[in-house]
């Protein structure tokens, strides 16, 4: 369990960990998995990107803004997923996942080290019972997750520092998620600054810095 800009997350890198995550959260398995990327190089080696999507990630990386986009996997990246059943648990039926950057220094450092040193993925989910928030406090992750986690990194002060003026009732507990695929999981076409091109990016979930991302 690691702190992020919006709260606490469960991080794991294989099927056993994914199974434990679903069991601990009592969560349904029909949503795209979340893949944490500790570098843009990792992102580009895993996900299919158009020049516009690549530029979007680059801008938010440079501005240190949390961003997650639902994208299809590169064909050559699929073979890097552990052959242990992980694939079925960390992507949806369209073979898409949500690829996330700039989620917070503690987790970013872990994800980068796992990938650069060991070639391991970092799959993630919020560390709270499904449908509930943790309020940015390690005390809010719940007894089930606490009992099943191998390691819990407590950094309530760090989480609070990202949204210091927001009360717990109005603070964001998640990052922005944007779908960059059509109903079949294929990349949307280049938009070229126009509004008539479809399919187009879809804001699936509001979150931290949504005003900056949508500007």
Please identify what each model-predicted range represents.
Residues 1-215:
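Active-site-adjacent structural elements in enzyme catalytic cores
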């Amino acid at each position: 369990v690691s702190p992020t800009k919006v709260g606490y997350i469960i991080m794991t890198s294989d099927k056993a960990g994914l199974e434990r995550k679903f069991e601990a959260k009592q969560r349904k398995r029909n949503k795209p998995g979340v893949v944490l990327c500790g570098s843009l190089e990792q992102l580009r080696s895993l996900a299919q990107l158009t020049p516009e999507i690549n530029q979007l990630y680059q801008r938010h990386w440079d501005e240190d803004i949390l961003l997650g986009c639902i994208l299809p996997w590169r064909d050559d990246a699929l073979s890097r997923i552990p052959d242990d059943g992980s694939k079925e648990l960390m992507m949806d039926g369209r073979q898409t996942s949500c690829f996330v950057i700039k989620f917070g220094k503690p987790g970013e450092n872990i994800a980068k080290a796992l990938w650069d040193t060991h070639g391991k993925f970092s799959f993630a989910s919020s560390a709270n019972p499904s449908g509930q928030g943790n309020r940015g406090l390690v005390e809010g992750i719940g007894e089930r997750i606490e009992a099943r986690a191998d390691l819990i990194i407590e950094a309530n002060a760090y989480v609070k520092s990202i949204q210091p003026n927001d009360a717990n009732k109005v603070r964001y507990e998640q990052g922005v998620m944007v779908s960059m695929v059509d109903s079949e999981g294929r990349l949307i076409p280049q938009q070229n600054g126009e509004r008539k091109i479809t399919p187009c990016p879809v804001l699936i979930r509001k979150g931290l810095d949504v005003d900056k991302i949508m500007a």
